[in-house]
Amino acid sequence: MNEKINIYLNFYKECLSPYSRSEYLKPFNHVVIFCREGNLKKDNKIFLDEGKAAYIHTSLDLNAGNNGAVLWCWELVDLENNGIRLSENDAKQYKEISELISIPKRQGDALIRCDTVSFPPSACAFTHTHAGPGIRVLLEGEIRIDGDQSSNLYKAGDAWFENGIEPVFAQATKETSSSFIRVIILPGEFIGKTSITYVNEEDLGKPKTQIYKGYIDEPLK
């Protein structure tokens, strides 16, 4: 039987001033960083450019570039250390979501995925579930997420959590294209495979208009 452990999946935004130093990772956690603006440097060389993502699981010292950096960060951290900040005092952090999830205890039995999902105007994602939990953040446009218990409209910069179990329906605005970036934790067998399952049989054969772009898809270390 696959033993599981409880761990926090957090999302926060961080604004670094030009050249400021930040120790992103401590021994107890894993971080996916998406560089929304600016860039990050390591040893005076570009480590992460604007619009790129990285999965970090070892202690690492990074500096913002000459224009600073706006970072969107997802972290996995154990229960004991969940309240500890990752970065130096000169950074501005804004934690927006903290959700307790369960993941396989054995190394390699879970994977971490970061990708974007884009929708043309008026497009939708039919009612579906996913094979694991994750946090989404809207990059552009507007999108409405309908679940069993609630319906919420999200705008650029808004973040939300999906547990993967509750079916959701996603409707993009008709005014413009919409897209979000997400980090989800999945069973290891889903590496390179879609995590989505459509709930209603009548939707299986319908055209799917959402477009995916992958950044990270690798075993959780």
Q: Where are each of the predicted segments found?
A:
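Local beta-strand/beta-hairpin segments that build beta-sheet-rich folds
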Residues: K45-F47, N89-S102, L204-G205, I211-I216
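A contiguous binding-surface segment within folded domains or other stable secondary-structure elements
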Residues: Q107-A156
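A short glycine-rich, His/Asp/Glu-containing loop-to-beta-strand
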Residues: M1-Y24, F28-H30, K92-A125
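Acidic/histidine-enriched, glycine/proline-rich intrinsically disordered or flexible terminal extensions
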Residues: I191-K221
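Short, conserved beta-strand element in jelly-roll/cupin
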Residues: K26-K41, H130-I145, F180-P187
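Short histidine-centered beta-strand/loop micro-motifs
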Residues: S22-P27, G65, A125-H130, Q171-T173
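Ligand-binding loop in jelly-roll beta-barrel domains
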Residues: N6-I7, F47, H57-N89, G164-K193
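Short acidic-glycine-tyrosine-enriched beta hairpin
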Residues: K13-S22, V32, N39-L62, F119, ...
